UniProtKB/Swiss-Prot annotation:
This is EF-hand calcium-binding domain-containing protein 11. Residues 17-52, 91-126, 127-162 form the EF-hand domain. InterPro entries: EF-hand-dom_pair (IPR011992), EF_Hand_1_Ca_BS (IPR018247), EF_hand_dom (IPR002048), Myosin_RLC (IPR050403). The gene is efcab11. Ca(2+) binds at D140, D142, D144, H146, D151. SUPFAM superfamilies: EF-hand. GO terms for cellular component: cytoplasm. It comes from Danio rerio. Disulfide bonds: none annotated. Keywords: Calcium, Metal-binding, Repeat.
Amino acid sequence: MLTTGRSFRNERQINDAERKKIELVFHQCDVDKKGYMSREDLKIAVVMLFGYKPSKSETNILMENGTIRDCKGVPLEPFATLMRRKMSAEDPYEKARQIFSAFDVHCRGFLKLDDFKSAFKRVAPRLQERTVLEAFRHADQDSDGHISFKDFENIISYGLANTCTST
């Protein structure tokens, strides 16, 4: 089978802020300053970058693809290449859907203020309630007391757009 190395999916471009984050995470996880990531370091890095613990098989694949000859782990350049590839394949809509679903613990298809408060209490326990209320009001575009997925996605997209343009 002949392949060109390109996929038919639309993969997004990685911006400078994301490149810097990958490098920063590498250095934070390489606590012993070995110049490479061990298997455990790599798992922690994936959690920091993508918010989930990779499976054993995913970790094996990352280790196999990132380890170079005469090195016990994954050095910065192969790590950065793997993480950029992984980031560019991420679907922002799916990510927003996952976050929304985590907030929507009652599976109603919308968020109420209590859902919002509860979610923020878990992820940012020191955040003032007033700030959470302001965020809710900002996200509730039609002021009906509910944040639909569309409202939520607009806020997430706005945040991503600002992250991408400010470097």
